Amino acid sequence: MLGLGKWACNVNTMFFSGEVKINIFDNNGEYGFEIDIPGIQVPDITVKSVEEDDDTVNAVVQTSLLPGKDIEMTVTFDEDEFDGFLKIPFIGKVKFKDGHRIAE
């Protein structure tokens, strides 16, 4: 499994601009994702599919905030750094900037 651990990055959207924390964990052999956005209650994330391609993870997830809508995530890891983006229905592409591993 790629990218397990806690990560942080900067995002800029019409709803939030600042640092976001992402926890990627092993959920009984499946990928699990938790996102922490200051001041915003992020609903639970249901993982629909995950594909690994070399150093890149492509995932499709859903949340109760957008029922029945797929959120696509692509993250490419390079040791303790990453870049990537989310494609969120009705919002569009949200880029991860300055992605880096943070202390456990």
Feature map (PLM): residue ranges:
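Central antiparallel beta-sheet cores of small beta-barrel/beta-sandwich binding domains
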Residues: 1-77, 85-104
